[in-house]
From Swiss-Prot:
SUPFAM superfamilies per UniProt: EF-Tu/eEF-1alpha/eIF2-gamma C-terminal domain, P-loop containing nucleoside triphosphate hydrolases, Translation proteins
Gene designation: tuf
Region (G3), start-end ranges: 81-84
Chain ranges passing through the membrane: none
EC number: 3.6.5.3
Protein name (record): Elongation factor Tu
Amino acid sequence: MAKESYKRDKPHVNIGTIGHVDHGKTTLTAAITSVLAKQGMATLREFSDIDKAPEERERGITISTAHVEYQTAKRHYAHIDCPGHADYIKNMITGAAQMDGAILVVAGTDGPMPQTREHILLARQVNVPALVVFLNKVDIADPELLELVEMELRELLTEYGFPGDDIPIIKGSALKALEGDPEAEKQIMELMDAVDSYIPQPVRDIDKPFLMPVEDVFSISGRGTVGTGRIERGRIKVGDEVEIVGIKPTAKSVVTGIEMFQKTLDEGQAGDNAGLLLRGVDKNALERGMVIAKPGSITPHTKFKAEVYILKKEEGGRHTPFFNGYRPQFYFRTTDVTGSVTLPEGVEMVMPGDNLSIDVELIAPIAMEESLRFAIREGGRTVGAGSVTKIVE
């Protein structure tokens, strides 16, 4: 019967568990499903079931990710959990699992560890909007130590640009909750209340300003030029003004027709594969890699800072390191653009399997904003992935 209640009448939010290895991320994920399942809000997922996460490919990169869904009284959640540290890095950088917020799991017995730091930094770099902390294993931790751990955590979060003083820190034991201990189950509900109230409701794609990456271009004699692609966000109506951004100087146009599967529409929206007929645009003025967007909503850039992950040899990546001045292609949305890489001071070379911050200068401008994801390619083969962290010019 519980299955029936999975109607999409609640707002949807994507979250995930992050934190150091063995601090209890997967146990917590299982505990959340176990506690909510008792209220008919989830299907119980065993630890072992979540732990052997299936492999997926995202932008040519293999990532193991477990997907769990559940709901609270207020929201419907899709929750991701990764078995390995490298999977988290890849997930966050490729945006395979776009997180609207995350639960940072820290063992009260250990306090913040190196991967705790790395995950907080990554969450900051790839713009995860909000974090809630679950201080785990409090049943076996020294109470005085817990106070120190909490202080240290708040300082660490502040250091990385999160509001450390305001972030909810919920203390509990995921294992005890999973075993059905009533007090520990209450702590899980407390955590979910914090997630409900502290992680902001994301703006739905359809409510964002219109943007469609151009995949293909053709002309209809006597009517004009059509750009086709999948609408990434927002909605578009016949008669709307748009800008064509990237590669060449930005141009303005008006949408005079919208087609989907050979049918004409009045409106296209996020997720639709559509063809847009553009007034007064020459066929040569539109090409793959440009975007058609709401005027003023996005601008073209060539220089940016990025957080990147470089594939290991075993993942199909490079076999050798690269150095300052490396010139691969950067694949944004629908096209490759060559760019040169400047490494951070003190970094001589980058090995396959590394993740780091780099500066990039492209040979042609691309419609860009912070958090935009891209692949790094060499002759069509993916060798890395990245996320724009800051636009320089």
